Structures are given as structure tokens and as C-alpha cells.
């Protein structure tokens, strides 16, 4: 979701200029497809989500600003959906999930083993879920997951699905919650995670292990007024289908991130986290954070083989060795030890999306692989990359066939207009 615009620092502009002076580090050839511009090629699209059932059906969501063509009743912004039935080679035209006056943000999409598609997003003050039982041809009406905790506007939803069990995390100011459904998203019961103030929470993602254990990752920002203080990466865990939750810190006391080189939302380049579990139940977390206050962020990786009771030493995912900004990391996992990661950085003087894989749970990794690519017709894209990340996150998924699904946003700056892109392989 777009956050209020923040005041910028000249110090960060200097850091960006340092990054621009660095040369590119050689990268391996990408195993993923040439990136495709999704939603509306003219923009303005932001914060995409993607998932695939592994049987050729791919679902791509984006937040569209500026009004949906031929939909006078659509909100601004509106969540749009595109569906592919040929494994992501072609997609139908974007269409709104919900037609109405209420603004929509932060789409998430997950698919269960039966091929039922679930989406969550912010609809006005609520966090809602819809489902499709016919490969995206039609969608149920939105169901507010927070109906039993009407305490204020919700933010930053995270979605996880296993069978008929649907879990949605969200926050209301300094409180954070998980709503659980055990009837396929038709009704929800909500549990408040924190009874005491732990910081300003933002959900980074959610996952369900094969044994039904649910994990969510949260970024906790400690602040006074608009000043950003230390930030934590918190993992919450439920072994009783969302009725109760335990807490495990993957990292704590992280320095606040840098300001932006142009106007941005609050804490836009601060800690952002993602989470995944493999088929053996191992847990993987990625997050970005600098080594010192307002310094250039690194993309970090940690894993747990004991359900979050302990965490491995953190690994710096990028091998470029430059003082560039590494932000918006994502993580996905499949069979035991099969881990995929992606992030954005500006090692070339512009931003690109980078990808790595590991077959042994992160003990060893492939080379850095550049996924994003030059395309003509967009002033903010050069041979070095794109000008700035567009949206608060990227989405990385690994479908049951072992195919990577990757979605991200690119733009001239935080305010856009920008575009969302898709690659798979």
C-alpha cells in the first residue's frame, strides 16, 4: 500500500551517487523467461502478486491506478487479475476482481492442491478474501476477514492456504492479527497476536508447511513520531490451525534503512521480509537491512530446521560487493532444501531484479542471475536497468512443477507512473 510521502536526506542521495559509479558485476545467463509487461502497458500498475498451480494455470494480480478502461464504476486504485492457461506464455486481458467505489491495495494470491484460487487484499478499511473455483473465470464476493475485530483500517495482508484452511495476517496500528478459515474462505475467526506493543508491525508474508504448521513473518518498526528506530524480523507460528501463536525473532535491532533519492512512502527502504517452507518443513526467511543507521541495505537470508526455535547465521545473498541498495527480497521453496531467492539492487547505477537458487537449504548457492532486462519505449528503463522499485514488495513463487514465478514493479520513482512485470522458468 502507498504510504505517506516522507522527507528525504541528502546523505542518501550521496549513497546513490556512489552506487551509480560502480560497474556491473558479471552474471550468469537467466533460466527465466524474458520479462513481460503485465496489466496495462501504459501503466499505472504497482505491487503485483503471482501464483501457479503447476498445471499451466497462472494467476497474476496488480494494483491499477488512474481508473480501469471501460469501467466507470471501478475504484482508483483497483486490483486487476490476469489468467494464463498455457504456463505463463500468454495471459488474458486484465479485469477487476471487484467493481465498486472502495479503494483496493496489497493483493496476494495462493492456490490449494485442488486448484481453487484464493486472493486477499485491502478493500477500504477491511482485509478481504475472494476465491475462484473455475480457473479464474469467476470470483466469489469479498469476505472481510476482520469482521470480528473492527478496530480501524487494516494494512499489509499476508495469505497462506492449505486445503480448505485459509490464513490471513494483517495489522491495525500497533496490533497485529491472523484470521483463520477452515471452510475454504467463507467464514473467519481472528486471533490477536500481540498483547503488548512490540513495534509498528507490517506483514511480510505467510506460508503453511505440509504438516499444517502456519508461519508468518512480520517487520516490527520501533519509532518515535516519524523517526525510525531499530527494526526486528519476527516469525509467528501456529501448530493448532491458527488458534494460538508463538513468537520467534529471526533478527532484532536492525538499523533503520535509508531514505529515498526522491519522495517516498514512510520506511519504504526499511526492513522488508519474506518467508517460505519446503516440503520437509524447513523454514526460510529473507529480509533487507543495512549494517548501520540509514546505510545501504543488504539482502539477508536465514533458515531454521527446528520450526523457528533457532536460526542459522545470516547470509548476505548478493555477491556484487558494492555499496548499492539491496531491497525487497523474496523467497520460495519446494522439495527439501530447494530454495529460490530474488531481490532488487542498483549495483549497475540503476535497479535490476536478481535471482539465486540453492539445492541444499542455503549452504551453497548459484551465481547471481539478472532477471530484469532492457526494453524500449519506457523512459525510466536503460541498458543499466530501471530507475526505481515500484511498490512495497516483489512476489516469488515456486509451483508444484518446479517452475519459478516472479512478479515485480518498475518505475521512474516512487510516485510513478510505473509498470508491473512477470517472468517464469
Give the location of each predicted region.
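N-terminal export and membrane-targeting signals
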Residues: 1-11
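Bacterial N-terminal signal peptides
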Residues: 9-20
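Intrinsically disordered, low-complexity boundary segments flanking structured domains
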Residues: 20-26
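Extracellular, repeat-based ectodomains that mediate carbohydrate processing or recognition
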Residues: 26-425
Amino acid at each position: 500500500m502507498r504510504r505517506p510521502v516522507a522527507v528525504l536526506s541528502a546523505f542518501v542521495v550521496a549513497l546513490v551517487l556512489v552506487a551509480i559509479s560502480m560497474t556491473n558485476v558479471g552474471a550468469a545467463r537467466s533460466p527465466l523467461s524474458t520479462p513481460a509487461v503485465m496489466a496495462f502497458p501504459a501503466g499505472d500498475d504497482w505491487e503485483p502478486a503471482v501464483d501457479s498451480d503447476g498445471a499451466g494455470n497462472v494467476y497474476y494480480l496488480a494494483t491499477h491506478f488512474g481508473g480501469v478502461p471501460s469501467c466507470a464504476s471501478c475504484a482508483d486504485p483497483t486490483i486487476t487479475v490476469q489468467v494464463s492457461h498455457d504456463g505463463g506464455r500468454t495471459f488474458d486481458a486484465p479485469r477487476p476482481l471487484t467493481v465498486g467505489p472502495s479503494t483496493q491495495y496489497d493483493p496476494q494470491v495462493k492456490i490449494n492442491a485442488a486448484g481453487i484460487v484464493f486472493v486477499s487484499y485491502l478493500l477500504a478499511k477491511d482485509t478481504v478474501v475472494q476465491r475462484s473455483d473455475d480457473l479464474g473465470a469467476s470470483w466469489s464476493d469479498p469476505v472481510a476477514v476482520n469482521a470480528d475485530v473492527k478496530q480501524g483500517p487494516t494494512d499489509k495482508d499476508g495469505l497462506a492456504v492449505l486445503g480448505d484452511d485459509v490464513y490471513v495476517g494483517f495489522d491495525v496500528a500497533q496490533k497485529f492479527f491472523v484470521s483463520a478459515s477452515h471452510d475454504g474462505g467463507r467464514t473467519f475467526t481472528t486471533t490477536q497476536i500481540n498483547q503488548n506493543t512490540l513495534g509498528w508491525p507490517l506483514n511480510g508474508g505467510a506460508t503453511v508447511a505440509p504438516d499444517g504448521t502456519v508461519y508468518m513473518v512480520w517487520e516490527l518498526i520501533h519509532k518515535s513520531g516519524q523517526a525510525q528506530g531499530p527494526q526486528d524480523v519476527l516469525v509467528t507460528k501456529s501448530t493448532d490451525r491458527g488458534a494460538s501463536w508463538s513468537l520467534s525473532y529471526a533478527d532484532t535491532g536492525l538499523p533503520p534503512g535509508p531514505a529515498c533519492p526522491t519522495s517516498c512512502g514512510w520506511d519504504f527502504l526499511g526492513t522488508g521480509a519474506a518467508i517460505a517452507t519446503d516440503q520437509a518443513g524447513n523454514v526460510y526467511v529473507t529480509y533487507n537491512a543495512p549494517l548501520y543507521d540509514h546505510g545501504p541495505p543488504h539482502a539477508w537470508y536465514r533458515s531454521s530446521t527446528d520450526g523457528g526455535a533457532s536460526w542459522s547465521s545470516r547470509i548476505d545473498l548478493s555477491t556484487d560487493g558494492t555499496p548499492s541498495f539491496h531491497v525487497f527480497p523474496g523467497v520460495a521453496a519446494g522439495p527439501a532444501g530447494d530454495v529460490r531467492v530474488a531481490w532488487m539492487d542498483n549495483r549497475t547505477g540503476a535497479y535490476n531484479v536478481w535471482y539465486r537458487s540453492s539445492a541444499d537449504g542455503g549452504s551453497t548457492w548459484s551465481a547471481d542471475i539478472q532477471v530484469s532486462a532492457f526494453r524500449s519505449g519506457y523512459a525510466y528503463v536503460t541498458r543499466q536497468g530501471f530507475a526505481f522499485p515500484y511498490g512495497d514488495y516483489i512476489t516469488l513463487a515456486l509451483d508444484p512443477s518446479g517452475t519459478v514465478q516472479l512478479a515485480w514493479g518498475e518505475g521512474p520513482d516512487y510516485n510513478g507512473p510505473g509498470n508491473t512485470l512477470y517472468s517464469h522458468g
